[in-house]
């Protein structure tokens, strides 16, 4: 220190000014570097965090080829894996019917006992016949909605943004059984089990309501607005908040079991969790507004890995374990890509350009992952193993598809479309413009004849079966299309709910 003072005293005033400026610049660089390290750490990889192949994502019994299943809640199962393991549902498809509405359907329907139930953005509840698309009943029960209902024993349980409420509605005819005013708006798709309805709200509360009358069993205040729907595994609810924390809450009594410090144990900075988490393999997976997807230990909250994309990740993560691909998580990003990442290590397996920004959930049905682009207004399907595009349909914005293991139901901007798998044999069909993996009606008879000939062992001479790879087939963008995401800051829809701003950025998600 004395030597430094001696040097300082020997300097001229001009030299002192220069030295002070250099020292200040160095100090700013060091502080900024330290801040960036805390605020924007590099991707984390912790191989010591527990991982189990015995927990979730494909461990439910695979449906028999001719058996339908019920998709009773957003995300399919209690862990919100967004994965239905069925061998039947794969392109090519034929269109069965299309129902066209007027308002945005931001969150996908649920499918129960031959009926589809959903709520549009204007709070209109709709029940459709799953075999025909015919409207069974339609009622406006709110003025603003952005969530899916949940079904349990003949009743639909739901929330709304305006008014701030929870509802129980009879599935048969839409009769309201009870209404519960909430302390703040909610777009948290409910989870119903053990006689309770679990939801979050913008006051930062996670609530358990009695399904018989809507009375509050418990409420727990978290670190910020809770917009995602909670996921469940082994007696615990998992949900992120707008304070940038992932939370584990005991379902029985609302006790907070663990809460990450901002973006994970030992990580500084903060981003918003809009993404509804998926719980599988002993881990919790969720996307964040800091452009990353995180994997946490479900028992302790310890961070296992983080994976950076080029823009916001509002997209809900799908977790699947299928033959040939192994445990993998799939998600979209505002950077216009869909990603497949090793569920254990966080290493990228593939990425594919989606042709637009993805805000809604990635959803896996069979061996295809589906995503919708709100800036491209389309729905795509990618092969789980390779990321190759096998399906395209020129409609879609947020929640892409659900299925009853016999039919695929696609959510367009304001429509619902039913697709049935079709055996084309060796017939090479031509798709309509903007589509891939969909056999046009005029060619379906030839396709069926080719399939019968194949079954009898007769060659058709039409060459190998096409998946719609002809003129007019939508081949999609090149792999790794990382065009500007530019989603802008947080969502907003006038004075209603927060959404990404207009001008190609679209509305705020689903998760």
Model-derived segments and their meaning:
Residues 97-111, 135-153, 160-163, 176-193, ...:
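Extracytoplasmic beta-rich repeat domains
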């Amino acid at each position: 220190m004395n030597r430094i003072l001696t040097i300082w005293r020997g300097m001229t005033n001009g030299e002192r000014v220069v030295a002070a400026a250099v020292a200040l610049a160095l100090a700013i660089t060091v502080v900024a570097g330290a801040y960036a390290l805390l605020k924007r750490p590099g991707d984390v990889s912790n191989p010591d965090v527990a991982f189990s192949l015995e927990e979730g994502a494909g461990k439910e019994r695979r449906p028999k080829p001719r058996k339908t299943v019920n998709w009773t809640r957003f995300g399919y199962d209690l862990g919100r894996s967004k994965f239905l393991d069925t061998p039947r549902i794969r392109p090519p498809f034929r269109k069965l019917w299309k129902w066209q509405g007027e308002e945005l359907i931001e969150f996908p329907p649920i499918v129960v006992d031959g009926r589809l139930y959903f709520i549009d953005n204007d709070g209109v509840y709709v029940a459709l016949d799953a075999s025909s698309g015919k409207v069974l009943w339609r009622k406006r029960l709110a003025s603003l909605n952005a969530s899916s209902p949940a079904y349990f024993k003949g009743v639909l349980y739901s929330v709304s943004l305006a008014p701030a409420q929870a509802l129980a509605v009879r599935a048969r005819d839409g009769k309201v059984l009870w209404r519960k005013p909430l302390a703040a708006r909610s777009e948290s798709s409910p989870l119903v089990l053990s006689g309770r309805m679990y939801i979050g709200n913008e006051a930062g509360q996670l609530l358990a309501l009695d399904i018989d009358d809507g009375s509050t069993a418990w409420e727990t205040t978290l670190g910020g607005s809770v917009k995602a729907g909670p996921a469940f595994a082994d007696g615990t609810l998992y949900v992120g908040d707008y304070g940038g924390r992932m939370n584990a809450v005991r379902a029985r009594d609302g006790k907070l079991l663990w809460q990450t410090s901002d973006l994970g144990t030992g990580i500084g900075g903060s981003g918003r969790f809009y993404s509804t988490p998926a719980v599988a393999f002993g881990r919790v997976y969720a996307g964040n507004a800091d452009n990353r997807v995180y994997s946490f230990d479900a028992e302790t909250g310890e961070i296992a890995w983080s994976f950076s994309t080029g823009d916001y990740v509002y997209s809900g993560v799908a977790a699947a374990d299928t033959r040939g691909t192994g445990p993998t998580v799939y998600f979209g990003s505002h950077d216009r890509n869909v990603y497949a990442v090793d569920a254990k290590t966080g290493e990228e397996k593939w990425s594919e350009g989606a042709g637009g920004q993805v805000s809604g959930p990635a959803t896996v049905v069979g061996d295809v992952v589906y995503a919708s682009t709100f800036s491209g207004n389309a729905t795509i399907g990618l092969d789980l193993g390779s990321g190759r595009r096998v399906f395209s349909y020129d409609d879609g914005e947020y929640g892409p598809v659900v299925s009853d293991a016999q039919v695929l139901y696609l959510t367009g901007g304001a429509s619902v479309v039913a697709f049935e798998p079709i055996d084309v044999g060796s017939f090479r069909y031509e798709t309509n413009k903007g589509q891939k993996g969909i056999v046009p009606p005029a060619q379906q008879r030839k396709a069926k004849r080719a399939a019968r000939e194949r079954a009898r062992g007769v060659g058709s001479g039409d060459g190998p079966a096409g998946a719609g790879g002809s003129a007019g087939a939508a081949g999609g963008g090149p792999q790794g299309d990382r065009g500007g995401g530019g989603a802008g800051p947080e969502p907003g829809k006038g004075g209603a709910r927060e959404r990404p701003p207009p001008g190609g950025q679209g509305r705020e998600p689903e998760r």
